[in-house]
């Protein structure tokens, strides 16, 4: 299996690989030779701790040069890299770490105390390596890693090398580990990067959290081409513009909610920063409204906006090119290179008609589709139809072959680029002693695209306020999953079979929004 990082470390050793810019002059640059050495030291450290091929190393922390290193180190050691969302509560994190059977954890110092508190409940976790600060008692630190050789570890077995596992919640509310095995030189990936126009000379800015498949995947593509990657630790709109200006950024991947923040800055603030270098704004994670597209195109080069549709499990499935952004508003584009898309109706028949009156569940076939849900074969099989796989989105196709996502079969909410699954929140809310049942769904939000809303049925005689519900949620859920608003009802609308009619609940909020409720 070719190790592109090692190749670039030899062919362009002095080229900047990672620029970790935290603002205020706090900047650390690693060349390709330095990134290779750091990844090798960490890979050798993992091997020294008994990590064998196919074992899991979970990493946790905001965007940083160390995150870039650990992803490569895991691959070099033949391990499976598992990103952990650092915004999860301890109980949520515990489930992921335990379920993936992690052997080693690589954690930034800020989140090391959470791992220390959970350590006694994680019998399969052998050791924790802490970076960027002093480790708690019983854990290892940067000095441990620094003592290892900068030469590559023994070559990993091809079966496991380059594998990743990213957790994505499902309709049960429990996260599922989507495993994708390494496929160097995959034709679909190469075709996508070629279509978008990636070049080795690009300066790529990563600002979305790298524990997500989109930011992590496109950063991986940039690294595979030998680009320079600028890392923003956490998104801040003006700082994002500063980075674009300072480094003459030409490519980036972002959620619409983040770009809305940047484009909504006062004109005098935006005027301080040069933006003409941007050639490829790759957008995903939520639909772009026509108004936001127009706002973006007024602030950035008009041929720079690329919209992609995909998921953690299925990779990139459709692409809307710059020339179609205003011509095809609401579309997610045509199938990406190497991707075959089909629509099936509820009876399992393929939908051949076009237009909004002919929707179907969207299935794809591609070499970039994930390989399994870890320990969840039944869930994996249930989402397949032969060689085609679905995540439950409902779509239609127009006469020119462009696809439009019109509903989410599983009611997933996308708020600020974060995937939120109502079943998980409902399960938490219904633990409140005053709540009889709850229905959670997304409502329009100018700031976040969608906001989490809960409709709650109180228990008879119970006294319950909106603040009570929100406070309880904050205690048990990550902040982005907490409902932003709450309404109360005597009962929830249901079908004849007893299923809650969330479409009925959503409809008043989405009226006039141009989207199917």
Residue ranges and their predicted role:
Residues 6, 48-49, 72, 76-147, ...:
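Structural core segment of the AMP-binding/adenylate-forming
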Residues 14, 18-64, 68-72, 89-94:
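Conserved AMP-binding/adenylate-forming core of the ANL superfamily
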Residues 186-203, 207, 211-251, 265:
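Conserved AMP-binding/adenylation subdomain of ANL enzymes
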Residues 13-16, 135-136, 146-167, 174, ...:
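Conserved pre-ATP/AMP-binding loop-to-beta segment of ANL
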Residues 67, 88, 94, 105-107, ...:
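AMP-binding/adenylate-forming catalytic core of the ANL superfamily
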Residues 29-33, 163-187:
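Conserved AMP-binding A3 loop
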Residues 56, 62-82, 86-90, 98-104, ...:
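A short helix-loop-beta submotif of the ANL/AMP-binding
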Residues 166, 224, 250-253, 263-328, ...:
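Gly/Ser/Thr-rich phosphate-binding loop
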């Amino acid at each position: 299996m070719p190790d592109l990082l090692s190749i670039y470390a030899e062919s362009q050793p002095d080229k900047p690989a990672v620029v970790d810019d935290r603002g205020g002059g706090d900047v650390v640059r690693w060349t390709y030779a330095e990134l290779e050495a750091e990844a090798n030291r960490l890979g050798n450290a993992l091997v020294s701790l008994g990590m064998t091929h196919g074992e899991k190393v979970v990493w946790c922390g905001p965007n940083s040069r160390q995150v870039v290193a650990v992803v490569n180190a895991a691959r070099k050691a033949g391990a499976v890299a598992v990103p952990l969302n650092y915004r999860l509560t301890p109980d949520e994190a515990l489930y992921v770490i335990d379920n993936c059977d992690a052997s080693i954890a690589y954690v930034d110092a800020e989140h090391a105390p959470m791992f220390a508190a959970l350590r006694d409940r994680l019998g399969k976790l052998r050791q924790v390596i802490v970076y960027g600060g002093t480790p708690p008692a019983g854990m290892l630190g940067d000095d441990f890693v620094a003592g290892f050789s900068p030469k590559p570890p023994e070559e990993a077995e091809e079966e496991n090398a380059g594998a990743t596992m990213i957790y994505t919640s499902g309709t049960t509310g429990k996260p599922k580990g989507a495993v994708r095995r390494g496929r160097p030189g995959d034709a679909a990936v190469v075709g996508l990067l070629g279509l978008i126009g990636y070049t080795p000379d690009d300066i790529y800015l990563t600002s979305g959290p790298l524990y997500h498949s989109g930011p992590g995947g496109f950063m991986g593509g940039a690294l595979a081409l030998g680009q320079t990657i600028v890392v923003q630790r956490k998104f801040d709109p003006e700082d994002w513009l500063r980075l674009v200006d300072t480094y003459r950024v030409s490519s980036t991947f972002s959620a619409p909610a983040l770009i809305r923040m940047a484009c909504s800055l006062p004109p005098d603030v935006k005027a301080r920063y040069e933006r003409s270098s941007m050639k490829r704004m790759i957008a995903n994670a939520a639909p772009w409204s026509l108004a936001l597209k127009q706002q973006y195109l007024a602030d950035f080069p008009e041929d720079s906006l690329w919209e992609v549709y995909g998921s953690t499990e299925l990779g990139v499935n459709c692409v809307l090119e710059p020339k179609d952004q205003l011509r095809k508003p609401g579309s997610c584009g045509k199938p990406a290179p190497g991707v075959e898309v089909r629509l099936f109706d509820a009876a399992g028949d393929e939908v051949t008609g076009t237009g909004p009156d002919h929707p179907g569940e969207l299935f794809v076939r591609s070499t970039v589709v994930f390989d399994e849900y870890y320990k969840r074969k039944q869930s994996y099989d249930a989402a397949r139809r032969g060689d085609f796989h679905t995540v439950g989105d409902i779509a239609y196709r127009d006469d020119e072959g462009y696809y439009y996502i019109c509903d989410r079969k599983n009611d997933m909410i996308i708020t600020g680029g974060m995937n939120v699954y109502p079943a998980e929140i409902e399960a938490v809310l219904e633990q409140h002693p005053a709540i009889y049942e709850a229905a959670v769904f997304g409502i329009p939000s100018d700031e976040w695209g969608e906001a989490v809303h809960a409709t709650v049925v109180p228990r008879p005689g119970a006294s319950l306020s909106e603040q009570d519900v929100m406070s309880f949620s904050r205690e048990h859920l990550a902040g982005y999953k907490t409902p932003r608003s709450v309404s109360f009802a005597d009962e929830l609308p249901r079908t004849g079979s007893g299923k809650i009619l969330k479409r009925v609940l959503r409809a008043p909020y989405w009226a006039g929004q141009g989207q199917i409720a």
